[in-house]
């Protein structure tokens, strides 16, 4: 790579097996969860414990929730509140319907670029 980065490039990890979470706690620069919800909050708390056990400051370790847009506004607010209460530092809103097939969540129903932009505006309005 030229020019060489002035700082190391952050490496975020994400898989919720105990071994993978321990590895993230030991060497990761951040962690991303593929979903959002109560079990994710519990896993985030467990990850913070592991980070502390590794002698690292868990309060500065970024953690991301991934929220499927297809869940709809009736769930967005609650899940966003759970993320805030759990001190989740990042929130990804997944508007791609293709991922709903493997995640088991409702598709977003968004097709065009304008649909996606309007969808993100609806999300922001619903959670702020």
Task: Please place each PLM-identified region on the residue numbering.
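Active-site-adjacent structural elements that line small-molecule/cofactor binding pockets in enzymes
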Residues: 1-128
């Amino acid at each position: 790579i030229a020019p060489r980065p002035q700082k190391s490039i952050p490496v975020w990890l994400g898989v919720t097996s105990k071994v993978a979470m321990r590895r993230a706690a030991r060497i990761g620069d951040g962690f991303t969860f593929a979903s959002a919800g109560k079990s994710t909050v519990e896993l985030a708390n467990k990850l913070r414990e592991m980070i502390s056990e590794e002698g690292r400051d868990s309060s500065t370790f970024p953690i991301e929730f991934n929220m499927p847009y297809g869940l709809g506004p009736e769930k967005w607010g609650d899940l966003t509140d759970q993320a805030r209460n759990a001190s989740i530092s990042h929130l990804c809103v997944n508007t791609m319907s293709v991922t709903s097939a493997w995640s088991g969540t409702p598709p977003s129903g968004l097709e065009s670029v304008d649909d996606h932009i309007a969808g993100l505006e609806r999300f922001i309005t619903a959670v702020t």
